[in-house]
């Protein structure tokens, strides 16, 4: 049996530190080795204790979590899980943290929540196991192709991601031209975060990116992100495909679920689709991607070396669902090739 993941809990609230410590300490594979109430205490604790993982509150006195994270990633890179309030402001800060290099995020529980921090221990263990090189500089982002350079086919693109997906999706979608194929995405994320993430992607990418709404028509040049929370994203509609938000129990522990999205794309589009599974914990999306491949779709998976967590892509690959495994930097361009988004004048 491997040694427990050693965690430092950083939060200015003694109550929240106690709750996080209690939740993590209930898992025998996790050991809370220290607590800190602000960035100064945390800096000294990191030097003294050398934790495997840090949980870090976004909002703290003196130096906020975002500024402290930047210092960690510059001076002593390590896996950091951000703990944020479930507000628009908290979501914006958390998304910025994930782009800086935070491993993942969790939302602070609301009043009466049944299982506060229910998946935190699993995220901590995944963070401790990760082989990611946190000190690697981010790759330069190439400008997106121009609209005039491409003509788009009739295929739908479906993408699923979880831990590490914020950075991965930005890397993929920034390769898309403004007239990209209709694209639907399920990214595991707390409920209030997906709207902020869609807005952020819309600012960073050439196509229009929006949080999916029930009945929204799938259109060229638009990307639809499943809202976090109570419903799953599906596609339906035959010759006039649209987004559907459906009430169903969680699948693979998730709502929205990547499997639910991929299943619906397989049924609606068959061979006229491309399925992509990116970095993430667990197995959500693997069975759905296999269904897409059996229906004739082209399927891609992210390579282990470029994943933050090689979980979902690994299971999909082992099931035979992945036609090609590619490094993250190559996935966007391959999607365009497979959707017949070719340069004008070529056949």
From Swiss-Prot:
The active site is at 162, 188, 284. InterPro entries: CheB-like, CheB_C, CheY-like_superfamily, Sig_transdc_resp-reg_Me-estase, Sig_transdc_resp-reg_receiver. The keyword Glycosyltransferase does not apply. The modification 4-aspartylphosphate is found at residue 57. It is found in: Cytoplasm. It is an enzyme of class 3 (hydrolase). Involved in chemotaxis. Part of a chemotaxis signal transduction system that modulates chemotaxis in response to various stimuli. Catalyzes the demethylation of specific methylglutamate residues introduced into the chemoreceptors (methyl-accepting chemotaxis proteins or MCP) by CheR. Also mediates the irreversible deamidation of specific glutamine residues to glutamic acid. This is Protein-glutamate methylesterase/protein-glutamine glutaminase. It comes from Rhizobium etli (strain ATCC 51251 / DSM 11541 / JCM 21823 / NBRC 15573 / CFN 42). The gene is cheB.
């Amino acid at each position: 049996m491997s040694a427990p993941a050693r965690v430092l809990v950083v939060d200015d609230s003694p109550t929240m530190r106690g709750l996080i410590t209690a939740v993590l300490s209930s898992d025998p594979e996790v050991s809370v080795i220290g607590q800190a109430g602000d960035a100064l205490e945390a800096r000294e604790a990191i030097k003294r204790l050398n934790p495997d993982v840090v949980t870090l509150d976004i909002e703290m006195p003196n130096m906020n979590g975002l500024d402290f994270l930047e210092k960690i990633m510059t001076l002593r890179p390590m896996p950091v899980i951000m703990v944020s309030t479930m507000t628009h402001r908290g979501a914006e800060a958390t998304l910025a943290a994930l782009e800086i290099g935070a491993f993942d995020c969790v939302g602070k529980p609301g009043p009466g929540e049944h299982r506060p921090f229910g998946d935190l221990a699993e995220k901590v263990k995944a963070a401790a196991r990760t082989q990611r090189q946190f000190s690697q500089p981010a790759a330069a982002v190439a400008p997106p192709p121009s609209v005039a350079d491409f003509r788009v086919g009739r295929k739908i693109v479906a993408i699923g991601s979880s831990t590490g997906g914020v950075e991965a999706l930005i890397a993929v979608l920034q390769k898309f031209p403004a007239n990209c194929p209709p694209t639907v995405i399920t990214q595991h994320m707390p409920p209030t975060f997906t709207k902020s993430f869609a807005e952020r992607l819309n600012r960073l990418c050439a196509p229009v990116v929006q949080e999916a709404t029930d009945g929204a028509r799938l259109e060229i040049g638009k990307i639809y992100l499943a809202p976090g929370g109570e419903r799953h994203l599906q596609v339906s509609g035959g010759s006039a495909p649209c987004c559907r938000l459906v009430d169903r129990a969680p699948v693979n522990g998730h709502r929205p679920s990547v499997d639910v999205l991929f299943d619906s794309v397989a049924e609606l589009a068959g061979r006229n689709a491309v399925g992509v599974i990116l970095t993430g914990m667990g197995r959500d999306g693997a069975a759905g991607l296999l269904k897409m491949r059996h229906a004739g779709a082209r399927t891609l998976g992210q390579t282990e070396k470029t994943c933050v967590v090689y979980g979902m892509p690994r299971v999909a690959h082992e099931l035979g669902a992945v036609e090609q495994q590619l490094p993250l930097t190559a996935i966007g361009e391959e999607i365009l090739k497979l959707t017949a988004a070719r340069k004008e004048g070529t056949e």
